[in-house]
Curated annotation (Swiss-Prot):
Source species taxonomy: Bacteria, Pseudomonadati, Bacteroidota, Bacteroidia, Bacteroidales
One Gene Ontology term of the molecular function aspect: phosphatidylglycerol-prolipoprotein diacylglyceryl transferase activity
Domain of life: Bacteria
InterPro entries listed in its UniProt record: Lgt (IPR001640)
Enzyme Commission number(s) from the entry: 2.5.1.145
Alphabetical UniProt keywords: Cell inner membrane, Cell membrane, Membrane, Transferase, Transmembrane, Transmembrane helix
Protein's name according to its UniProt entry: Phosphatidylglycerol--prolipoprotein diacylglyceryl transferase
Binding residues annotated for a 1,2-diacyl-sn-glycero-3-phospho-(1'-sn-glycerol), in chain numbering: R143
Pathway terms, separated by semicolons: Protein modification; lipoprotein biosynthesis (diacylglyceryl transfer)
């Protein structure tokens, strides 16, 4: 009997070592998205609209802090509160891993609310519409970082593109004989996020949606990102053991439950924007 030609994923997560400290691909890809690609695209948008450059500099700081703090606290509160309640000092040990995208999104929204009140004096939707455009590519880079870490993958599959994550202890426990691959959900999500990014770019650059429909771009972003997340979560392995009881009781895991409010908010924003286009003359 011939086994399917699964893809053996034996990627070293460590890029190099600097002064005894490992520099990992995940951190590089995270930085590539959050510090380089995202801000570069955002700056081009700022120049296109001839906005105050000081606004852009302030936005970068607000978003960076909101992303890191929100993502970390999201992981602490949503996925392992008991552990961090018993070990509060571990909350600050971010280099050991543990960032939640739902928490990061909440952190960004709070940061944008503060930014809109203190810096631009414009509505939070004005800020979010412009920030949502490059965020999809940032999210895709983070998921590719998860791939380099051989983490957050899917259930076993007989499909030929299944990945054998042989560096993952979790995979070896799940598939002891390593005779099956698992869904590379990191790639699935990255592709979905890139599609959302492309759609948001089209809305901004080709349809001038940020100035014509308040809330449309961020609505499309929230709906696209978190609907794809909701669907792909169906084939992911659980991140925490207690999620099994959650699935037994409500049929959904934590990632799916947290995605629902964002999808609903996104749909509402899209409907609101289409029904109430901005009518004033554009400069």
């Amino acid at each position: 009997m011939t086994l399917p030609a699964f893809i053996t994923w034996d990627f070293d997560p460590v890029l190099f070592t600097l002064f005894g400290h490992p520099i990992v691909w995940y951190g590089l890809l995270f930085a590539l998205g959050l510090i380089i690609l995202g801000p570069w695209i955002e700056k081009k948008m700022w120049e296109h609209e001839k906005l105050d450059s000081k606004w852009f500099e302030s936005l970068a700081v607000y978003v960076f802090v909101g992303t890191i703090v929100g993502a970390r606290l999201g992981h602490v509160l949503f996925y392992d509160p008991a552990y961090y309640l018993a070990n509060p000092a571990k909350i600050f040990v971010t280099w050991e891993g543990g960032l939640a995208s739902h928490g990061g999104t909440i952190g960004i929204i709070i940061a944008c609310w503060l930014y809109s009140r203190r810096v631009t004096r414009k509505s939070i939707l004005w800020v979010l519409d412009r920030l949502a455009v490059p965020t999809g590519i940032v999210a895709a880079m983070i998921r590719l970082g998860n791939l380099t870490n051989s983490e957050i993958f899917g259930r076993p599959t007989t499909l030929p593109w299944g990945f054998r994550f042989i560096r993952s202890e979790e995979y070896r426990h799940l598939v002891p004989n390593m005779d099956m691959g698992c869904h590379p959900t990191q790639i699935y999500e990255a592709l979905c996020y890139l599609a959302v990014f492309a759609l948001c770019m089209w809305l901004y650059w080709k349809r001038d949606a940020a100035r014509r429909y308040s809330g449309l771009i961020v609505g499309v972003f929230l709906t696209g990102i978190f609907l794809s997340r909701f669907i792909i979560e169906r084939i992911k392995i659980v991140q925490e053991p207690w999620e099994l009881k959650l699935i037994e009781s409500v049929g959904l895991n934590m990632g799916q439950l947290l995605s629902i409010p964002f999808v609903l908010a996104g749909i509402w924003l899209i409907i609101r924007a289409v029904k109430n286009p901005i009518t004033q003359k554009l400069s």
